[in-house]
């Protein structure tokens, strides 16, 4: 495989890629970073937040100026002191469920917040070229990811 791949922790014989995404409340992708599949999520937080386009940063800043709180929902893999400190320094309120708490909340009838990101995973995996990585160069794969994200955004703006 090409660059930006690493040993897949679930399938030792193949290389894999990790797509770290930042989505808005409806699941529309606004930030994207690629790395090897063996890279831990905690190490991708800074680069994923830095991948926000200027328009999204302007909207975020306007929301904060109006007194709005900017929350960030993350999975249990992000539950670390380093991530919480980074998010606090950048002005985000972290919503990170510890491992096992999501099962308890499901029993209590609460809805999980991460389903929006999981839906975005599903939308991107509908593009066969992304589901099975054929591109050797990370630039080509990243370009296809950006194209798919643009198409998802366009579709949601028209029909969303």
Per-segment meaning from a language model:
Residues 49-51, 59-62, 99-102, 123-124, ...:
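Short, surface-exposed, polar/charged, turn-prone segments marking secondary-structure boundaries
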Residues 1-93, 98-99, 148:
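Polybasic low-complexity intrinsically disordered regions
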Residues 86, 90, 111-160:
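Basic, amphipathic alpha-helical segments enriched in Lys/Arg and hydrophobic/aromatic residues
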Residues 103-109:
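Short, charged, surface-exposed secondary-structure boundary motifs
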Residues 45, 71, 110, 123-124:
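Preference for short coil/turn "hinge" residues that link or interrupt alpha-helices
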Residues 43-44, 62, 104, 137, ...:
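Flexible domain-boundary/linker segments
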Residues 77-79, 100-103, 122, 129:
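Short Gly/Pro-enriched loop/turn and capping motifs at secondary-structure junctions
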